[in-house]
Amino acid sequence: MNASVVLNLHLISDSTCETVAAVAKSALEHFRSIEVNEFVWSFINSCEQIDKIMSLIEHDKYNFIMYTMFDDDIRRYLKQKAEVQEIPCIPVLSRVIRELSCYLHVKKDPYVNTGMGLDDEYFTRIDAINYTIAHDDGQNLWDIDKADIIILGVSRTSKSPTSIYLAYRGYRVVNIPLVNSINLSVDLSSMKNKLIVGLTIDIDRLIEIRKTRLVSMRNQNNCQYVDYEHVLVEIKETKRICMQNGWPIIDVTQKSVEEIAATIIQYFNKMQH
């Protein structure tokens, strides 16, 4: 593999993923020329969740799995699925645990919390989560200059869940809804050293999502919210604003939050170099 090849690194854990992420970070320090997209899959505790993860992996790319998994059955299932798809699948703790058990002649505990301690990275992440929640849906823009990432998009394009996912990774995120005929209250074009990214989506898929949303809210009389021409204008305006300012646009149609976040992190890392 050379520097022009991108590695999709999948970190899987039945806990918070902090342990496997820390090991991965240390390992990658030895390969700084390699471009890496990280996909973090936390609290995985069923074979169905493993199936979903494996179905989302793009097989025409370089993929690598690192994991911590306490349940023996789920761990074996993950390894079997990875073998079938010919993806390297490396446990980061099993060898150490096995060697300790053999050496001391003591069985491993029936349950263990694999989360890490309250270090600086932990508090940085908590701060990012608090900041991101406070700035969800265009709120509290008075200190937007403290954000690492600003996400724009029309309603129901996964802005909020993507923001929270990124916050868990330690990024301060502001997400701002773009609404027709309403001007932004801040001048984003003057923002320096901020990644600003727009989210767009297939119009038919967006209308379908919005209709489901209206049903759940028992507010099916909001015709403009799901009107094809109105929604089309919203999407076009988002693209126009982003293209005019040179901000990247991500099509989130059929993409998971993890995939959207991985793409945003890739843009962010490129901006830093």
UniProtKB/Swiss-Prot annotation:
Pfam families per record: Kinase-PPPase (PF03618)
Q: Where does ADP bind?
A: G153, V154, S155, R156, T157, S158, K159, S160
Q: Which UniProt keywords apply?
A: Kinase, Nucleotide-binding, Serine/threonine-protein kinase, Transferase
Task: Name the protein family.
Answer: Belongs to the pyruvate, phosphate/water dikinase regulatory protein family. PDRP subfamily.
Broadest EC class assigned to this enzyme:
transferase
Name of the protein in its database record: Putative pyruvate, phosphate dikinase regulatory protein
InterPro entries recorded: Kinase-pyrophosphorylase, PPDK_reg
| Domain of life of the source | Bacteria
EC no. given is 2.7.11.32, 2.7.4.27
**What are the recorded GO MF terms, alphabetically?**
ADP binding; ATP binding; phosphotransferase activity, phosphate group as acceptor; protein serine/threonine kinase activity
Q: Which HAMAP family match?
A: PDRP (MF_00921)
Q: What does this protein do?
A: Bifunctional serine/threonine kinase and phosphorylase involved in the regulation of the pyruvate, phosphate dikinase (PPDK) by catalyzing its phosphorylation/dephosphorylation.
Catalyzed reactions: N(tele)-phospho-L-histidyl/L-threonyl-[pyruvate, phosphate dikinase] + ADP = N(tele)-phospho-L-histidyl/O-phospho-L-threonyl-[pyruvate, phosphate dikinase] + AMP + H(+); N(tele)-phospho-L-histidyl/O-phospho-L-threonyl-[pyruvate, phosphate dikinase] + phosphate + H(+) = N(tele)-phospho-L-histidyl/L-threonyl-[pyruvate, phosphate dikinase] + diphosphate
